[in-house]
Amino acid sequence: MTYKYIITQSLAMLMSLASNAFEVKSGQMVVVSADTARMEPVAKTALKMLKGDIRKVLGSEMKLVNTSVNSSIILQRDAAAFAYKKEAFLLKSANGCLYIKGSDDHGLAYGILEVSRLLGVSPWKWWADAEPKQLKAFSLKEGYHNEQSPSVEYRGIFINDEDWGLMPWSGKTYEPSDIPGHIGPKTNARIFELLLRLRANTYWPAMHECTRPFFLTEGNREVALQYGIYIGGSHCEPMASSTAGEWKMRGVGEYDFLNNRENVLQFWEDRVKEVAGQPILYTIGMRGVHDGAMQGAKTTEEQKTVLDSVLKAQRELLGKYVNKDVAQVPQLFVPYKEVLDVYHAGLQVPEDVCLVWCDDNYGMVRHFPTAEERARKGGNGIYYHVSYWGRPHDYLWLGTFSPALLYQQMSEAWHKGIQKFWILNVGDIKPAEYQIELFLDMAWNMNRIYSGDTPEKELQPNNEWLAEHEWNFWTREFGRKLAAGMLPVMQESYRLAYIRKPEFMANTRCEERNPKYKIISDLPWSEVYIRARLADYKSISDKAEKIGGMLDKAIAKGELPKERKDEFYQLFKYPVQAAAQMNNKLLYGQLARHGKEISGSSRDVSAEYWKKSEAAYDSIISLTKVYNEGYYNQGKWNRMMDFQPRRLPVFNRVPHTVATQPLAKDPEYIACLSANDCISASPLYLWKGLGYECKAIGIVRNQEIGFVFDGKKVKGDSVTIEVRWVPTHPMDDKLRFSLSLDGGKPVEGEVQTRGRSEQWKVNTLQCQARVSFTLPVARMKKHRILIKALDEGLVLDQVCVY
């Protein structure tokens, strides 16, 4: 056999494979074989979406037929092929055809929309003006195989605190209505389209009193059915009833199960009868009308007695109207705030009900399931926030929530058995686009991120997956060249906001009785640190402007559609520049209050710093105006972006006052070490991107790690060691550690906090839990600190010595 023969045969094989590839050329009719008569609405809706995507990308039309003959795409539903997994799909290229198989109609829909992704259509096509690029042809090689299935059964988002964004945008801009608080079917169809593109299936609708309730708005039920979305409700919205908005409209008397039982039951029964034939995730239990404790019952024991009766009565209604086997009805119980105390007091929640745990509203999961809770038939869920209204301070404006924190906490949640239900409080959707996609992608594919992981094993961070996810997001939206500049800027922006969110920069608080928290005042930062932070923001601000110029050139060359300028502004420029200007406004104001000089000048120029602060405020107004008016989208997002939600003091101009106390001084640090600078005999679990320096590490129970610092800088006979932790909550009861210096007797510290204590508020606002020890020190060249984790769940950020 000659080399010539081998090469000839190889080329023949390659040509054969190429000839059998699935290919669609621009303008070519795409024939799809589908038994639409047997399809559920969700799959039909996905086909309509694909049809529009094909027309947009290829300029081709799509034709549906009921035979596979001469079809280029063949749809099939086959539960057995996926071992009866829910919502699974397979894409396979064979003999010039593309086969899309689904284990059910949801799986088929996700498979259909996977083709849209392969065509280059972003899930944010509509919601971020991500206009797709046009192609001359699209192909998949012979043998292409893409099989996927969800890790979490119920995955979705919660629209919340919509008063200044989504609600006025919907009711006045996108879907104008004379009905106050209108969020109607046109808006919800767009939300559900996004959910399908992100492979989600669950929705908690907006529920503030300012918004007309979902089920009382004509057309909303029908559009949810069309998109195959499970409708649910938060911890204070049992039985598919938005209590905050609906009780005053259709309830009778007080919302008090103890003293008004029949009317409360009728309120729930009317709704269950109405929606019995629709996919609903029923939240069961009871709280107050809106995020308050239930009426009537005062003590924990009384609340337990009432809740026990509530659960029995609610399940009787579900058995009567939805399914006689009530265990087949999806149900959630959310032990939130005072209800968690009732649960811990011994409330018996039926075995088939999913327990939904919560974070502390700032991204730290409060409870991880015990072994007994993990074994429950109903499983465990999570209600997580990347946007929040409440104490100690709102963060509703900019989507600065740390992706690394979300990734770390949701990885821990999955690892500890929270795998049935994931819901994300997203505010108004915009501007939390990346966090939403990260959360839902994790819910979809956690099995591939952490294959084979069990709670008995230590969780090992998969930093490569997160880095790849971030890179893929930005390259998909803007291409590799722009993404190479954008990603580092966004990572630095997230890091700076992790240290202090833009909304926290005035040193004010929400819902506090003490009037001092309503007044803009100094942050406890030194002049050196303030100037360094201003420089960091100037650096990313300048880079963002430079990248904007690169985008304009790419559009001018035809490398990107012009509409991507709007997307660039929404996803990148506005969040970066608005955060930078918020810091400029408040930090230049702080320097001005203290009469500080511009670097290199010997004169008092506080007036010039006041001008910088004022200019930053004006800049935020201008930036927001551009966001709402757009470049090419004709004001599509008008009223979506409000730079001062709830009209809190932090959003005002900084009052021109004179400080009566000096600026804080930094300690004379002997050493300030990143957690990743430690020495350990056992493996270190680095959470890349997490913490003040993006190098936080998880320490497993009984693991000991060491730090070394130079003795030359030690001046006295004692040192203070400040251990700075990511302010997580215990996985069991406590978060303790021990520390020793130079082999001395270990001292013990605690990281956990109680409820909404003052220490928790401080930790939350600075995103660190700091524990200090002052210890005697001898003269030596090198000193060694040993830190040992006494409990599970500790994540170390920094160790500072002074």
What does each of the following model-derived ranges do?
Residues 1-23:
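Bacterial Sec-dependent N-terminal signal peptides
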Residues 20-149:
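Contiguous, structured surface segment used for ligand recognition
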Residues 101-102, 163-184, 201-211, 247-263, ...:
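The substrate-binding groove and active-site-proximal loops of carbohydrate-active enzymes
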Residues 124-180, 186-206, 378-381:
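An acidic-aromatic substrate-binding cleft motif
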Residues 130, 134-135, 467-640:
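C-terminal non-catalytic alpha-helical accessory regions
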Residues 138, 208, 215, 223-226, ...:
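Gly/Pro-rich turn-and-neighbor structural signature
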Residues 644-802:
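Extracytoplasmic
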